Regions:
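TPR/TPR-like alpha-solenoid repeats
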Residues: 131, 138, 209-210, 216
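Extended ligand-binding clefts on enzyme/binding-domain cores
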Residues: 227-292
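Membrane-proximal, proline-rich intrinsically disordered regions
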Residues: 21-84, 88-91, 99, 105-109
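Bacterial Sec-type N-terminal signal peptides, specifically the leucine/valine-rich hydrophobic h-region
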Residues: 17-18
Length: 292
């Protein structure tokens, strides 16, 4: 009984102390500086550009058509990863690009740190078109219209290549008509914010896509080709080259694969026909100087 009385006494005292406390404002003391509450659109663009060459130069396609074969880790050579082969495209660069579009559309002023909002959206649309064009050329039907919605739709419908190409042309047209050449763009590790180069990128992609569909939709192909040809890349000096760096985290992934590792080897199918690949065209160059 005495213990019970003591217990209730301590409880009452504790509640009294709690009730007498004032709310203390700790300011930013409990905020994690390493976990920003808002995404930086400049950082999102850098991330999307950083992941792009890793995707488009992915080694899996070379194994699936048996140009090369795995030596140590053999999952891809045995086709055991094909069911998730494009997951990283959606959860990585494409999600970053969609976030740039959404943030600048909903709250343009708050995200002006990434540059002129129109340019952020335009570049995100150009890269989004590039991503999806590459994906549908690789895998055929993939989710597009219902993709990138996160938990709001975890089972997006697959779209046809025709629908994706049509949407891609629209993205490029919207980007070209809205970009501001006198505006700014931050986080751009490809062209350093030069919007004239982004316009050439968009027109060159548009030209490429038009040529891709020439046999499927000749009329649309001609229209888009005509629209893009004068604004596309016109010389080798204008080639678009991703600026790989020297450190391991940002160097060319193919260098890592072959410089010090032995993960891949030339497949028998390729090596057995090597004489055909190497020498079938030599007759056209016999006696011709290679020049300086």
């Amino acid at each position: 009984m005495k213990n019970t009385i003591k217990y209730f006494g301590v409880l009452a005292l504790s509640l009294g102390l709690l009730g007498s406390c004032e709310t203390v404002d700790f300011g930013n003391e409990n905020l994690n500086p390493n976990q920003p509450s808002k995404a930086s659109t400049a950082a999102l663009l850098t991330s999307a550009l950083r992941s792009l060459p890793s995707h488009v130069s992915e080694v899996n396609g070379n194994m699936w058509v048996q140009y090369i074969s795995q030596v140590t880790y053999t999952e891809e050579s045995r086709y055991s990863t094909t069911q998730w082969s494009y997951d990283g495209w959606y959860s990585g660069g494409l999600k970053d690009l969609q976030e740039i579009i959404d943030l600048n559309t909903l709250d343009a002023v708050a995200y002006s740190g990434g540059g002129t909002s129109a340019n952020q959206i335009a570049v995100a649309k150009i890269l989004k078109a590039y991503y999806f064009q590459f994906m549908t050329d690789t895998w055929g039907m993939v989710p597009f219209n219902e993709a990138l919605l996160g938990v709001d739709n975890i089972t997006p419908a697959f779209d046809t290549q025709e629908a994706i190409y049509t949407a891609g042309f629209s993205l490029l047209d919207e980007a070209l008509s809205s970009m501001n050449n006198s505006g700014t763009l931050n986080g751009d590790i490809l062209f350093n914010g030069d919007m004239s180069k982004w316009a050439k990128f968009a027109n060159t992609l548009k030209l490429t896509m038009a040529m891709r569909i020439a046999d499927a939709n000749e009329s649309l192909a001609k229209t888009k080709y005509t629209e893009a040809i004068t604004g596309a890349i016109g010389s080798v000096s204008e080639n678009i080259e991703y600026p790989y760096l020297s450190e391991d985290t940002n160097d060319n992934p193919w260098q890592d694969r072959f410089e010090t590792r032995e993960d891949y080897a030339l497949s028998d199918i390729r090596s057995n026909r090597m004489d055909i690949f190497l020498f079938s065209q030599c007759r056209f160059f016999i006696g011709v100087s290679s020049g300086p």
